[in-house]
Every structure is written in structure tokens, then in C-alpha cells.
């Protein structure tokens, strides 16, 4: 029987998810693991869209005083009755998600942080009337939530100490130390770096965290999440009992993302098991610690769409959820060896890289190697094994693109980059269009070889020959459309006894051009492939549609490609 529970597309509030009868993949073992391997401050680094916010919301719902304990009925953690008795609903919890902090200026972003902290503090309005708080304490609380001219009015000094002050006031009221949860701690740093106020934001975040996490005697423990582990020296200076759980750590490795068993169970629950292979190829492949996990955002979105249309094909939900500028920046900075490495990745192969897990944002683009590290930590690449470095005790990682979806991300960014490169190369494009009109096969091949020498191949080397031919067809079509805006270009146009690959109608009303594209498995076969193309044009009478338009001065080209080389043969018909 098909599950009738709603799928939680975009739902990252644990309480809402449980109260509103959404499907939930049980990750409550995370609570047990955190308590059993306790650390005063724990940072989880995972790629975006891997359930970080939902897990942090779940922690809040479990520990917070006054929680609805029935939210956890039937879940893993409810089986540990001793732990639930000791910890469930026993602590004040301060919860911040910084994922929405951004701004074109530091003042704008700083106010967003003020707003988030003040609104979180407003959840504890009972502090205003608390008998345990002194008048001075109440004044400090009121200062955190104070409003002036419709805007929250915390000054810089209070902002720095606000989380520490709030935990102190909660301790005074409840007699229990506070748990502090900060979700997506590094988003403000990312936005600051992009908008030119990185140093100011680092100073602010370091100050807030220093007061809340380092010198805070009213802290029970803290949990943070983010995509990157910003170097300890930059943000987490002086934190001694500080633990980072990254994608390379085996502990907690199944708590962010869906395991294979969880995906199989989800598909069974919705009678979707026949789609397992597609979902695995597109959304699996991430290796965290010793676990193989799927991106939960993709799985939930795709199964939800399958419920409406069982014939829908997998697509790139991850790419649509936020920007993929990091891949584009790598491509833009790539030298010839980096382009070669990207081509190996696109072809499904591995590359070997030494990885740094603790970078500052201003270091990310300082070297290509740093960019590879960030692509790994943010989920664009995943680990496929280790390689011991020669004359060293250190190991490098074998890196691979995890799945079809991320491969599509790379391909799209490469295509966008290549379009911009071609669009800015007017000289080569003009020479190409002139050579085509002049029937200069040598210059046609020369200009195409120049262009292909600059490109990053997105050709799947394992694909059948007809798919490779389609790739070169699309490449040439795109170049021709950018070479002369006055040409009318048709692709796969019915003509004679078939469909011509490319048909061009130049400004001259008497002229016409027919092109047939072929793929050659190696350079030695280019001549033969061109001859086959020319024979096909004549046999299928691909020039007929042009002649029907009154165009009688027709040039036919057979153009063959092999990797990044090509040859052109032309003939007037």
C-alpha cells in the first residue's frame, strides 16, 4: 500500500515536520552519538542540502525545556529511555540559523545578525518577569530585544556578548546551562568575501563565538554546522574543547544524507522501487567517512515529483537550489593541466589531490589546489580512495565526481564558460565564417582546431559513437551561430531523402551551405570520415531544400572530429 504521508520538500523544521505528518527519515541517533562522544563545541561540516538545518532543529526539539516529547514517539532515540529521561526537555536552547545572512555591505549583513539574535531572544520573553533575574539582568535582556524606529537597536558591544548574555540569563532563570546551536555558521563569511567586507565579518563572528563558546561558564555544549571548516586561527581562536566532524570522519557519517537502506525504504513506502537505479546513478555517490550516502534534497524532490508523474526523468535539483559559481571560478582560472584534470573527471575518471580541510575564504582562490579542496568539502567531488605520497607519510585523495547530477553541474558551467570565451573571440569567429564562405577547408579546420584547443571537453569517452557525433554537431552549431549574426542556420532540417546536420543561408540570396558532421575514433580516420560525410550529402540530396529556396550556389562540407582535432572537406554542388 502506498504511503500517504506528505514528502517534506523544503521543510527543515523538525517540529513542523512531525506535527504535520510529513515523512521523516529517522536521524535521531545523532542525539545519542553527540551525548556519548561529548565535546563542549562540535562543528559538523557537510555540503549544502544534506539535512544540516533539519538535524539542528531536531536537536533543539529534543533538548529544549518545555518540548513536546511526543514528537519523538516511535523514533530511534525513544528506545533509549534512560537517555531521554536524563536529557529530553531539560535545557534552555539558543538556536540560530545564519543561512539568510547576506548583504552588499557589512552594515547590512551585521544588522541581519542583530535581527536574528534579537528575534531568538524574544522567544524568552518570560525573562522580563522572571523572579530569578535582577533588575540589571532584565535591563540587559531588554537591551538585546530593544527596538528603535522600527529596527532592533543592539550596539556593537552588546552584539558581541549577546549569546553569552542570553545563556547567562537563561541559566539564572532555569538553573540549567544553555545549549547553543548555530546552523550554517559560515554563510555570513561566504557572502562577506563575495561582497568585499570579509575582514570585518571575520572580526564580528570571531567576537560573538569567542564570548559564547570560549569564555562562557553558562554553556552546556554547542553544536555548529557549515559547509567549510574555516581555519581555527581565523574564527575559533582559543577554543580548546573544540571538535570538527568533517566529511572524512567515520563518526556521525550516516547522520547527514540518506543511506542506501533509507532510500530503498523510502522508495518501497511510496511504491517507487522501480526507480531505484536512476536515483542511485543521479543522487548517490557521496562518501562521508565510511558511509555511502545520497543527497537528501535530491531524493525527496525527485520522489515527490514521481508521485505526480511516474515517467519524470531525474534532473538537477541541487543545481537549482543555489549558485554553482565555485565550479565556474575553477574553470575560469584553469591552466592546461587543470583543464585536462577536469576532462578526466567528466569522463568518469579519478584525479589525485592533497586536500586542505581548513581554509579561510580569502585563501580559497589563491591557488588551484585550494579550489580543489573546496570542491571536495562542498560536495562537487568525493573521495574514491587514498594514495600514499612518495617519500612521505602523508596521503592524497583519489577524487571523482559523485554522480550524474554533479556531472551535469560541471557540464553546464563549462558550456557557459565556453560560450563566453567564444563570444569574446570575434577575430577567430570572423575568420571561421569567412573561410566557410570562401570554401577554404584548411582555414576552417585551423580555426576550429584553435577553438577546440582552448575548450574543456565534456565528451563522455564511454558514450556510443552516435552520441559523440551529436556532441560535435552541437559544438559546431553553437560556434556557427556565434560566427555571423546575419546567417540563418537550421539544424536537422528535412531535405531530400533525410535530415541534414546543419544548413546555412548566408546574406547572399544565391548562396547556401550544407554541413554533415562525423565522429572519427582516431586522427587517422578523419579523412575517411569526411569522405563518408560528403557521400551522404550527395546520396541524400541534402542540398534540395536550399535549391527550393532559390539558392543555387551551394557548398557542401564534410567535417570530421576526433578528440580536439578536426578536418574539413568541401565541394561546390
Task: Show which residues each predicted segment covers.
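Walker A/P-loop-proximal flanking segment of P-loop NTPase domains
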Residues: 1-80
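Conserved P-loop NTPase mechanochemical-coupling segment
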Residues: 9-18, 108, 112-160, 188-193
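P-loop NTPase motor core
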Residues: 10, 61-126
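Substrate-engagement module of ASCE P-loop NTPases
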Residues: 121, 162-173, 200-220, 542-545
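Amphipathic alpha-helical segments of the small helical/lid subdomains adjacent to P-loop NTPase cores
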Residues: 234-237, 245-304, 341
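Extended alpha-helical interface modules used as scaffolds for assembling large macromolecular complexes
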Residues: 242-243, 294-541, 566-573
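Domain-level recognition of nuclease-like catalytic cores that cleave nucleotide substrates
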Residues: 545, 549-573
Amino acid at each position: 500500500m502506498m504511503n500517504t504521508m506528505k514528502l517534506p520538500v523544503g521543510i527543515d523544521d523538525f517540529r513542523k515536520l512531525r506535527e504535520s505528518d510529513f515523512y521523516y527519515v529517522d536521524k535521531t541517533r545523532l542525539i545519542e552519538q553527540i551525548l556519548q562522544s561529548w565535546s563542549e563545541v562540535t562543528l559538523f561540516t557537510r555540503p549544502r542540502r544534506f539535512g544540516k538545518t533539519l538535524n539542528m532543529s531536531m536537536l533543539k526539539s529534543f533538548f529544549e525545556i518545555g518540548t513536546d516529547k511526543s514528537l519523538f514517539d516511535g523514533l530511534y532515540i525513544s528506545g533509549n529511555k534512560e537517555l531521554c529521561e536524563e536529557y529530553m526537555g531539560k535545557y534552555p536552547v539558543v538556536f540560530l540559523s545564519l543561512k539568510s545572512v547576506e548583504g552588499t555591505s557589512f552594515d547590512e549583513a551585521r544588522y541581519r545578525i542583530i535581527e536574528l539574535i534579537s528575534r531568538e531572544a524574544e522567544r524568552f520573553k518570560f525573562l522580563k518577569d522572571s523572579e530569578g533575574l535582577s533588575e540589571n539582568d532584565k535591563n540587559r535582556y531588554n537591551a538585546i530585544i530593544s527596538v528603535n524606529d522600527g529596527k532592533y537597536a543592539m550596539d556593537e558591544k552588546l552584539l558581541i556578548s549577546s549569546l553569552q548574555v542570553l545563556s547567562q540569563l537563561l541559566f539564572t532563570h532555569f538553573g540549567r546551562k544553555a545549549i547553543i546551536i548555530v546552523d550554517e555558521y559560515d554563510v555570513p563569511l561566504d557572502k562577506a568575501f563575495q561582497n568585499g567586507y570579509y575582514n570585518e565579518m571575520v572580526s564580528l563572528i570571531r567576537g560573538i563565538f569567542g564570548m559564547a563558546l570560549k569564555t562562557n561558564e553558562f554553556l552546556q555544549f554547542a553544536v555548529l554546522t557549515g559547509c567549510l571548516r574555516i581555519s581555527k586561527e581565523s574564527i575559533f581562536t582559543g577554543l580548546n574543547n573544540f571538535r570538527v566532524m568533517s566529511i572524512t570522519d567515520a563518526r556521525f557519517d550516516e547522520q547527514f544524507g540518506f543511506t542506501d537502506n533509507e532510500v530503498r525504504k523510502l522508495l518501497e513506502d511510496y511504491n517507487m522501487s522501480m526507480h531505484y537505479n536512476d536515483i542511485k546513478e543521479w543522487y548517490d555517490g557521496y562518501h562521508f567517512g565510511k558511509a555511502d550516502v545520497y543527497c537528501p534534497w535530491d531524493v525527496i524532490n525527485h520522489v515527490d515529483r514521481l508521485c505526480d508523474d511516474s515517467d519524470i526523468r531525474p534532473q538537477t535539483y541541487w543545481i537549482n537550489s543555489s549558485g554553482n559559481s565555485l565550479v565556474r571560478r575553477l574553470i575560469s582560472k584553469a591552466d592546461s593541466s587543470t583543464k585536462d584534470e577536469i576532462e578526466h573527471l567528466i569522463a568518469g575518471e579519478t584525479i589525485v589531490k592533497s586536500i586542505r580541510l581548513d581554509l579561510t575564504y580569502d585563501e580559497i582562490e589563491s591557488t588551484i589546489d585550494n579550489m580543489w579542496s573546496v570542491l571536495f568539502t562542498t560536495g562537487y567531488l568525493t573521495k574514491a580512495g587514498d594514495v600514499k605520497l612518495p617519500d612521505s607519510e602523508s596521503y592524497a585523495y583519489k577524487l571523482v565526481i559523485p554522480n550524474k547530477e554533479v556531472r551535469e553541474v560541471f557540464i553546464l558551467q563549462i558550456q557557459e564558460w565556453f560560450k563566453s570565451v567564444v563570444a569574446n573571440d570575434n577575430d577567430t569567429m570572423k575568420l571561421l565564417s569567412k573561410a566557410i564562405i570562401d570554401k577554404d577547408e584548411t582555414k576552417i579546420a585551423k580555426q576550429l582546431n584553435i577553438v577546440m584547443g582552448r575548450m574543456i571537453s565534456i565528451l563522455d569517452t564511454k558514450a556510443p559513437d552516435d552520441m559523440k557525433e551529436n556532441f560535435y554537431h552541437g559544438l559546431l552549431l553553437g560556434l556557427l551561430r556565434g560566427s555571423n549574426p546575419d546567417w540563418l542556420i537550421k539544424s536537422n532540417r528535412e531535405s531530400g531523402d533525410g535530415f541534414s546536420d546543419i544548413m546555412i543561408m548566408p546574406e547572399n540570396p544565391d548562396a547556401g551551405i550544407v554541413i554533415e558532421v562525423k565522429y572519427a575514433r582516431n586522427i587517422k580516420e578523419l579523412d575517411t570520415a569526411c569522405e563518408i560525410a560528403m557521400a551522404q550529402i550527395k546520396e541524400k540530396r541534402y542540398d534540395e531544400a536550399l535549391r527550393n529556396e532559390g539558392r543555387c550556389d551551394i557548398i557542401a562540407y564534410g567535417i570530421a572530429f576526433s578528440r580536439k582535432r578536426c578536418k574539413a572537406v568541401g565541394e561546390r554542388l
